């Protein structure tokens, strides 16, 4: 029946009987899914990159354990070397032993910083930044090289003392027992230096694993 009222709709508004969505003025959609404006696309990260970042987060726990080991081993190493003293013999008498102590102090400080930075991804659940991974890899390489050099230098001096002794001020050195405690502390410090070196090397290998996706993808 004609009621005298015309059915007027605002321009741009239409109803599709076969669709649950009703267009409203301004181009919106009522009772339906949101429409992405033309020219805008959602770019989801690739599944490969997502998997890699997930694995990196899982490796953060192992990395943290290695950092703690590096710190503990380096602290023990420089503590033993600093306490190496007997009958006037001290670590500063030998340049290589001073080098061992100095490098272990540096590595211990570096490990503290890495422990703090390693906790952050575990707490936040986010993947480390690419720049951080590159810097960490370089620092790990440098730390490993310095620890290896210090350990090798200290080991060569320890072998020289054990085989030929130190004739000048300490009799026959470790042979006649005048500085056996000094020798024992120095040798133990060198051993812990090498253990710290191996932990840093493993951390460096993990750094390669973490960096690989950013270099390939």
Curated annotation (Swiss-Prot):
<keyword id="KW-1133">Transmembrane helix</keyword>
<feature type="transmembrane region" description="Helical">
    <location>
        <begin position="99"/>
        <end position="119"/>
    </location>
</feature>
<feature type="transmembrane region" description="Helical">
    <location>
        <begin position="62"/>
        <end position="82"/>
    </location>
</feature>
<feature type="topological domain" description="Cytoplasmic">
    <location>
        <begin position="1"/>
        <end position="61"/>
    </location>
</feature>
<feature type="topological domain" description="Extracellular">
    <location>
        <begin position="83"/>
        <end position="98"/>
    </location>
</feature>
<feature type="transmembrane region" description="Helical">
    <location>
        <begin position="142"/>
        <end position="162"/>
    </location>
</feature>
<feature type="topological domain" description="Extracellular">
    <location>
        <begin position="163"/>
        <end position="187"/>
    </location>
</feature>
<feature type="topological domain" description="Cytoplasmic">
    <location>
        <begin position="209"/>
        <end position="217"/>
    </location>
</feature>
<comment type="subunit">
    <text>Homodimer and heterodimers.</text>
</comment>
<dbReference type="GO" id="GO:0005886">
    <property type="term" value="C:plasma membrane"/>
</dbReference>
<protein>
    <recommendedName>
        <fullName>CASP-like protein UU4</fullName>
    </recommendedName>
</protein>
<feature type="transmembrane region" description="Helical">
    <location>
        <begin position="188"/>
        <end position="208"/>
    </location>
</feature>
<keyword id="KW-0472">Membrane</keyword>
<dbReference type="InterPro" id="IPR006702">
    <property type="entry name" value="CASP_dom"/>
</dbReference>
<keyword id="KW-1003">Cell membrane</keyword>
<comment type="similarity">
    <text>Belongs to the Casparian strip membrane proteins (CASP) family.</text>
</comment>
<feature type="topological domain" description="Cytoplasmic">
    <location>
        <begin position="120"/>
        <end position="141"/>
    </location>
</feature>
<feature type="region of interest" description="Disordered">
    <location>
        <begin position="1"/>
        <end position="21"/>
    </location>
</feature>
<feature type="compositionally biased region" description="Basic and acidic residues">
    <location>
        <begin position="1"/>
        <end position="11"/>
    </location>
</feature>
<keyword id="KW-0812">Transmembrane</keyword>
<dbReference type="Pfam" id="PF04535">
    <property type="entry name" value="CASP_dom"/>
</dbReference>
